[in-house]
Protein backbone atom coordinates (compact mmCIF):
# COMPACT_ATOMS: atom_id res chain seq x y z
CA UNK A 1 0.00 0.00 0.00
CA UNK A 2 0.81 3.68 -0.20
CA UNK A 3 1.90 3.98 3.43
CA UNK A 4 4.56 1.27 3.26
CA UNK A 5 6.00 2.92 0.16
CA UNK A 6 6.21 6.30 1.87
CA UNK A 7 7.97 4.88 4.92
CA UNK A 8 10.63 3.15 2.84
CA UNK A 9 11.49 6.05 0.53
CA UNK A 10 11.17 8.91 2.99
CA UNK A 11 8.69 10.55 0.68
CA UNK A 12 7.25 13.49 2.58
CA UNK A 13 3.83 15.05 2.55
CA UNK A 14 3.55 18.32 0.60
CA UNK A 15 3.10 21.35 2.87
CA UNK A 16 0.31 23.69 1.82
CA UNK A 17 0.18 26.07 4.79
CA UNK A 18 0.55 29.57 3.28
CA UNK A 19 1.83 31.08 6.54
CA UNK A 20 4.61 28.51 6.77
CA UNK A 21 5.47 28.87 3.09
CA UNK A 22 5.67 32.67 3.47
CA UNK A 23 8.56 32.37 5.96
CA UNK A 24 12.10 32.77 4.68
CA UNK A 25 14.33 29.73 4.76
CA UNK A 26 17.81 29.74 6.30
CA UNK A 27 21.02 28.36 4.83
CA UNK A 28 21.51 24.62 5.07
CA UNK A 29 24.55 22.91 6.60
CA UNK A 30 25.98 19.42 6.19
CA UNK A 31 23.69 18.36 9.03
CA UNK A 32 20.83 18.71 6.53
CA UNK A 33 22.01 15.95 4.16
CA UNK A 34 18.99 13.80 5.03
CA UNK A 35 16.70 16.67 3.99
CA UNK A 36 18.32 16.63 0.53
CA UNK A 37 17.68 12.89 0.23
CA UNK A 38 14.08 13.25 1.42
CA UNK A 39 13.48 16.12 -0.99
CA UNK A 40 14.88 14.19 -3.97
CA UNK A 41 12.79 11.14 -2.99
CA UNK A 42 9.67 13.30 -2.72
CA UNK A 43 10.33 14.95 -6.09
CA UNK A 44 10.86 11.54 -7.73
CA UNK A 45 7.57 10.31 -6.25
CA UNK A 46 5.78 13.32 -7.79
CA UNK A 47 7.57 13.52 -11.15
CA UNK A 48 4.38 13.01 -13.12
CA UNK A 49 3.14 16.45 -11.98
CA UNK A 50 6.11 18.19 -10.37
CA UNK A 51 9.41 19.45 -11.81
CA UNK A 52 10.99 21.04 -8.76
CA UNK A 53 10.62 21.44 -5.02
CA UNK A 54 11.99 23.54 -2.20
CA UNK A 55 12.63 22.14 1.28
CA UNK A 56 9.88 24.25 2.84
CA UNK A 57 7.40 22.29 0.70
CA UNK A 58 8.18 19.30 2.95
CA UNK A 59 8.14 21.42 6.09
CA UNK A 60 11.85 22.23 6.42
CA UNK A 61 12.88 25.89 6.38
CA UNK A 62 16.25 25.44 4.72
CA UNK A 63 17.62 26.82 1.45
CA UNK A 64 17.58 23.55 -0.45
CA UNK A 65 15.90 23.03 -3.81
CA UNK A 66 15.66 20.07 -6.16
CA UNK A 67 15.09 20.32 -9.89
CA UNK A 68 14.07 17.77 -12.52
CA UNK A 69 15.85 18.24 -15.83
CA UNK A 70 15.03 15.58 -18.38
CA UNK A 71 15.84 12.20 -16.81
CA UNK A 72 17.95 13.78 -14.05
CA UNK A 73 17.02 15.25 -10.69
CA UNK A 74 19.60 17.36 -8.91
CA UNK A 75 19.84 19.29 -5.67
CA UNK A 76 21.04 22.85 -5.15
CA UNK A 77 21.95 23.83 -1.60
CA UNK A 78 21.90 27.51 -0.61
CA UNK A 79 21.35 28.63 -4.22
CA UNK A 80 21.94 32.29 -5.07
CA UNK A 81 21.00 33.66 -8.48
CA UNK A 82 23.94 35.91 -9.40
CA UNK A 83 22.87 37.00 -12.87
CA UNK A 84 19.63 37.04 -14.86
CA UNK A 85 18.85 38.24 -18.36
CA UNK A 86 15.88 38.25 -20.71
CA UNK A 87 12.78 38.98 -18.62
CA UNK A 88 9.48 37.45 -19.76
CA UNK A 89 5.99 36.97 -18.35
CA UNK A 90 4.64 33.52 -17.63
CA UNK A 91 1.76 31.78 -15.85
CA UNK A 92 3.01 29.33 -13.24
CA UNK A 93 1.41 26.65 -11.15
CA UNK A 94 2.66 25.17 -7.88
CA UNK A 95 1.99 22.01 -5.89
CA UNK A 96 1.38 24.20 -2.85
CA UNK A 97 -1.34 26.23 -4.57
CA UNK A 98 -4.40 25.70 -6.68
CA UNK A 99 -4.43 27.25 -10.12
CA UNK A 100 -1.77 29.37 -11.81
CA UNK A 101 -0.49 32.89 -11.34
CA UNK A 102 1.37 35.33 -13.58
CA UNK A 103 4.99 36.19 -12.76
CA UNK A 104 8.20 37.52 -14.30
CA UNK A 105 10.98 35.06 -15.07
CA UNK A 106 14.33 35.35 -16.84
CA UNK A 107 15.48 33.34 -19.87
CA UNK A 108 19.05 32.91 -18.66
CA UNK A 109 20.39 32.79 -15.12
CA UNK A 110 23.63 32.04 -13.33
CA UNK A 111 23.56 30.39 -9.93
CA UNK A 112 26.12 29.87 -7.17
CA UNK A 113 25.21 26.85 -5.05
CA UNK A 114 26.52 23.82 -3.21
CA UNK A 115 25.85 20.38 -4.66
CA UNK A 116 24.51 17.55 -2.51
CA UNK A 117 28.09 16.79 -1.39
CA UNK A 118 28.45 20.44 -0.28
CA UNK A 119 30.97 21.26 -3.02
CA UNK A 120 30.78 24.80 -4.45
CA UNK A 121 29.28 24.96 -7.94
CA UNK A 122 28.42 27.68 -10.43
CA UNK A 123 25.91 26.89 -13.13
CA UNK A 124 24.38 28.63 -16.13
CA UNK A 125 20.82 27.67 -16.94
CA UNK A 126 18.36 28.75 -19.57
CA UNK A 127 14.76 28.19 -20.59
CA UNK A 128 12.63 25.69 -18.70
CA UNK A 129 15.25 24.59 -16.15
CA UNK A 130 16.07 28.24 -15.38
CA UNK A 131 12.36 28.88 -14.81
CA UNK A 132 12.10 25.97 -12.35
CA UNK A 133 15.16 27.17 -10.42
CA UNK A 134 13.76 30.71 -10.15
CA UNK A 135 10.43 29.36 -8.86
CA UNK A 136 12.13 27.21 -6.22
CA UNK A 137 14.52 29.98 -5.11
CA UNK A 138 11.42 32.17 -4.62
CA UNK A 139 10.07 29.48 -2.26
CA UNK A 140 13.26 29.72 -0.19
CA UNK A 141 12.67 33.47 0.05
CA UNK A 142 9.09 33.00 1.25
CA UNK A 143 7.63 33.98 -2.12
CA UNK A 144 4.92 31.61 -3.32
CA UNK A 145 4.90 32.45 -7.05
Protein language model annotation of sequence segments:
Residues 5-145:
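Positively charged
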Amino acid sequence: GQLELEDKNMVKKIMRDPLFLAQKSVDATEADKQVITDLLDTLRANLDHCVGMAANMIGVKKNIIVVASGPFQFAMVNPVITKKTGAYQVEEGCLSLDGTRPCTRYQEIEVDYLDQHFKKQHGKYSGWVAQIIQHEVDHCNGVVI
